[in-house]
């Protein structure tokens, strides 16, 4: 009963939105009956873990045929669709720690995510005469711990990957932006995995590989996981859903430390635009406190390159196993990376054990001239996002005069347009967020957070060292400026804006939002010391009236 309550509480803590729930059900909910009937001869549905058998058994009465199928029959014809996750358990762990980890993995299996676990032991030296025995013992510990929580698990102590490139494959290294796996698989190698998943068991894999002489040798667990992620979709997805849906790295150190968060972990990483920058800003002391962080970062980039675009990787400490459930349901970081820094650090939302979520992500670019913009693609983005027809002629005529910069995510799947509006009082331009748009197909996949973080770095967060991101913008150099924007009072996105803004002002059918320049606030707080900031500072006097007047005079961009 205690485990059931813990399971339910873990789900409730995820606090999924309506979009999160729909996305989860689309991945794990019942499959259409017609589709299931057509594919049942070739698809293998991974059964859920067995429930505890009843104390006594009785003969099941014959169920008469009814015109309307009963819920039981309907559930049989429409089973919950199970997916697989590649899970790296990077020990060593104590029995108590391992118990916490495996409990979380069993909870995931109840929700439809079946783990393919690869075990590793950082403290076991390579080449030790007892290494094979120690590794196999560790595999058996994991199996026993899983079974203790009611799951069925199968140890796989033989090699299921082979060293070297796959026969017949070309060397694509020069064309890739990630390091390809140093291992590969052949269809017969994964018979143990297929068999375990078919039987409803969680496979627990040893980090062994076959060399060119067909000898089983110990390899890094990253090589096993990368090899599985690269070959599983093409070889096994038709027979069993082995194509990995998530990558989970469970270790003793937690996520990847960030220089922007005083050594606390990154919350969300856009691998396409941040990978090299993380390497460049990784401090020397972290190589001792988080020795496997960069190798796990490389593993995530390799695996996600082969996984579906909606997939993600999570790097989590053994102290935060419940966060795995939240990640599965929402596919989001534990805390949004676009929230204000003061809010994240002021109420202890961030801890050394906060997990890091990693996505393949999208490149982010900053343009300062209208001539650099692809107008056709930007038009399509704005019209799909807002559901309205853009008045292109007047819109771009205004940008020619007022544009400060445009941030573009990927191939125009998201954009933030900032203009310089006239301030009649001070004469200094007002930074105005004219448009913030993300394609509906990319809402919920992290693009919104990637875009807002870049917007922060170019406007109200400018001047901080952590705003020096390589996206073609100001590189963190300059003075931050207040950012202002408006939104319809009935816009459902306003709740998201409330969380990220410094304040808001209702203006009839509109709401005016703003974000204060963070560096100026920091300087003022330091100048006043323990007295803190007053309710209304001198430099705040009259600015809301000025902003409201300037924003109210901006013409509509729509037909």
Curated annotation (Swiss-Prot):
Disulfide bonds: none annotated. The keyword Mitochondrion applies. It comes from the Eukaryota. Transmembrane segments: none annotated. Residues 162-188 are annotated as: Disordered. Belongs to the acetyltransferase family. One of its GO terms (cellular component) is mitochondrial matrix. One of its GO terms (biological process) is L-arginine biosynthetic process. N-acetylglutamate synthase involved in arginine biosynthesis. It catalyses: L-glutamate + acetyl-CoA = N-acetyl-L-glutamate + CoA + H(+). Pathway: Amino-acid biosynthesis; L-arginine biosynthesis; N(2)-acetyl-L-ornithine from L-glutamate: step 1/4. Residues 362-538 form the N-acetyltransferase domain. The gene is ARG2. It is found in: Mitochondrion. This is Amino-acid acetyltransferase, mitochondrial. One of its GO terms (molecular function) is L-glutamate N-acetyltransferase activity.
